[in-house]
Amino acid sequence: MPLLELRGVAARYGALQALRGVDLSVDEGEIVAVLGANGAGKTTTLRAISATVKTSGDLVFAGERLPRRPEAVARTGIAHVPEGRGTFAQLSVDENLRLGAHVRRDRAGVKADYDRTLQRFPILAERRGQAAGTLSGGEQQQLALARALMQRPRLLLLDEPSLGLAPRVVADFFAVIAELNEQEGLSVLVVEQNASLALASSARAYVLEVGRVAVAGASAELQRHESVRRSYLGY
């Protein structure tokens, strides 16, 4: 049974139909990528999972229907790092991290995860009293990820994590994601504009076009798929 399964999911913004019956799944311990042009429905797919947009169809997580309130979704074990990072600019690094654990009640576990997070991201430890808005783009992306990890999620949703970042910063970020997946079994659903990076970092991938799944399969196979190569890989 998949950890996450979407069946016939549709969503709209007013008169605009953003998703048109999307079927998608993520297995336990799997990294899955979602590719597509601007307006294809990638971000809306993540918003549908997080219940920040109204949907129809079936959304199932760990064998149960997902609730349709964002905080309730977070309590199920899904953490969402949105496009643009979504950190609270006026709050300190420390305050952002502690807000990430707001759905938890296990104080000892939160303290252990806080310490572990600062060990994983030493620059955040150095700057934990600093306002998030004063951090560099790469540091803000680290903070957004660290805050999500404070939820202790089973599934991590990442929306365009490489956007606006230098190649070295992007490589380091995806190295952390790979480590979390390999060492802790964290499942990841990532929307990514860099198709080459997304396919190299994932086990399976979906290509969305105008709100529908146009192509799906193993990432290694999609790297050889003619239309994917032509439209998204540039060769």
PLM segments and residue spans:
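Glycine-rich phosphate-binding loops of nucleotide-dependent enzymes
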Residues: 2-235
